[in-house]
Amino acid sequence: MEKLAAFILVLTLLCAYWQSAEGIREYSYADCTDVKGDSAHRYSGSRCFCYSPGTVIKWKDIWSTFKVNVSSNVDVVVVFPMETINCHHPDDLLTVMNCFVEHYWPSTVQRETSLEIPLVDVDICFMIKSPRSNTEYTLHVSNKRLNRMCFLLFVCGLILFFGARNICRSSLFFYTTGVSLGIIATFVFLTLLLRNFVPKRGLFLVLLGAGSGLSYMGIQRVLNEWDDIVTEHWMELLAYVLISGLFSFAVCYKHGPITNKHTLNFMTCSMQAVGIVLLYYGITFPPAYFVLVAVLLCWKILPLAWSLLMGICSLFYSFLALFRRRRRPTVRLLTEEEYREQGEIHTRASLDELREYCNRPGFPAWETVLRLRSPQRFAEFLRQGSHITQEEHQNHENHYGLGGAYYENVIFNNSSSSDTQSHREEAEDNSEDEIVGNSPPVLNNLPSPTIYPPTICPYPPVTYTPQPEPLDPEDQDFF
């Protein structure tokens, strides 16, 4: 979806550049008359004029235009741009593509008695056409000034581009767009409404394209005959707006706002493309527009490019990891002395934590004392005393210390097992024919099991007195 957004924005930028390249050509004709700002002169016949800004274009001039007004008793119009691009001898590939677009979708040439013409850093030429060569007219050219409509379009374009995500997820935008689409483009609205009944996606796209074409033709027809419709058929127009608006609102209210993630992303991309178009019509100086759009595209595409670069790097490192030999970490076993030292350290730390926990104000001391066998020993432990007695320590050292009973059993068991193994090897070397049938089996010296002291229950013994269970009413005697 991010790639689709970038493609839509780039396509919008190219279309805007094609349109701007047509009307911002540098015309330098020897027979054109130079005019200055805030000047009014009388002329006759069709002729071309060139206006020079006279000053360097500044940042505040990107929303500025100059106004050309012609007044006459007959139909005299201002034509801008005065001619189309030379498609017979194109200069570059962009001109060829622009000519191709111009051939199938010709742009409209402005023919009005008053025009707002944008500023460029070269002379701007326009033409005054009159029906006869002796027709006189008055031409008035004003200086550059801030075009409020262009500035408003620029602000709206920025708002749509940066706020497209929040706007598309707004319920107000959903209902407003649905009602407007139902009124203006009824065929498109009905096609989207009946989408679930169309079996194939290709057929749906064909129907959507046909509905869009019919809606466009209807809008063009209404705009061409707007005056007659408003004056003669205003009641029918009002009834159509009310009925289609209420029906569209009811359908939108039934289905609710859009929650599909892909649809919302597509709407966001379309909204950003509309914002780019508004920026194009809001900025009158084309270089400033292209710089701004380049910055916006970089801001939009950089996160996608960064994620793509990180994905490529991760794949490359994963590919290199297949050829690198994994080294297993060397593990060193602890010695007996290190094992004893770590045991003492961790035991001391655990005892300190236990002592700290028992000295807290919220510790249930009385309940704990009632459950202990020797509360005095527990109190001495809390006063930084030892957790074992001297006798217990001596018994532990005698059993597990150096020269203790535990290591003696281990040593003797190992020696007994080695003697048994040697006896087995000698018995295998004897002949198979010399078998002693009555010889008793040799018993293996098994290691004596480790004797552990009996466990001591920390809770005091409590005598259990069984309580008689009450009899049910059904079990009682009736006599």
From Swiss-Prot:
Gene behind this protein: nemp2
Family (UniProt): Belongs to the NEMP family.
Protein name: Nuclear envelope integral membrane protein 2
Ubl conjugation listed as a keyword: no
Function statement: Contributes to nuclear envelope stiffness in germ cells. Involved in male and female fertility.
GO biological process entries: oocyte maturation
InterPro entries given in the database record: NEMP_fam (IPR019358)
Topology versus the membrane: Multi-pass membrane protein
Positions of the UniProt region annotated as Disordered: 414-479
Biased composition (Low complexity): 438-449
